Amino acid sequence: MRTVDITTKIETLREAKAYGRIRLKPETVKLIKENKVPKGNLVEATKLSGIFGAKKTGELLPFCHPIPLDFVALEVKVNEDNLEVFSTVRGIARTGYEMEALTAVTTALLNVYDMCKALDDSMVIEEVKLLEKSGGKSDWFRRLDGVKVNLHAENEGLRKIAEDYLKELGATFAEEAELYISIGDNLPINKEIRSLERVISLYDFRRNPKEVGKEIRVGWSDDALIIILPESEEKIRFFFETFGGIIGNLLCRR
């Protein structure tokens, strides 16, 4: 058993929202609305329990990565015969906040059950579900279906590695192309995309400081996107596994 390896993922702003509902007797709801539950203010305690649950997700679930939480909010809605909980969890991380949002809702509902168990033996937690998530790979990753690529490399082994990644992305190969990738040899770049190059360099350095100096260059030459990769299997795999999905985004924005 093991966790999913997220080493190659990019840290991005991510958000998840979840929902849950517990059914209660109308008499119990009345006590909640009148703030007469013996253990105290149920609504506020439920919000706090949800926040606490979100923070403890990585400890409760063995395969869930512990990730930083930049924002957690719980909304509690008291209805005639049920109580609804909505959670929002946000942060900058390599993986999403779905489990944190779901755990927040679940913990909040369990708190309702705990605070009311002496008052209501008919309670049922009816539903817990993810409402939405954003900021992950699905938001910015674009395949290269229909994109023509000119791939140049003297080293056949390195060429095959890059070719396999490009095929997996859906690219086709041609002499006249909209994307030119060179392994080892420089190609003329009229306008380098400095912001992306800096991000790539930063992530590259964090992965392996000993490889610093073997730069990956990205930019435009006329109407074609140019990518220059060093003759390094590690660098080639790093680029495609971490930033391969951004290539399609660049071409779409051109």
From Swiss-Prot:
Residues bound to substrate: 63-65, 99-100
Keyword Cell inner membrane: no
Key word Lyase present: yes
Gene3D superfamilies associated with the record: Molybdopterin cofactor biosynthesis C (MoaC) domain
Species name: Aquifex aeolicus (strain VF5)
Protein name (record): Cyclic pyranopterin monophosphate synthase
Any one biological process term the GO annotation gives: Mo-molybdopterin cofactor biosynthetic process
Function: Catalyzes the conversion of (8S)-3',8-cyclo-7,8-dihydroguanosine 5'-triphosphate to cyclic pyranopterin monophosphate (cPMP).
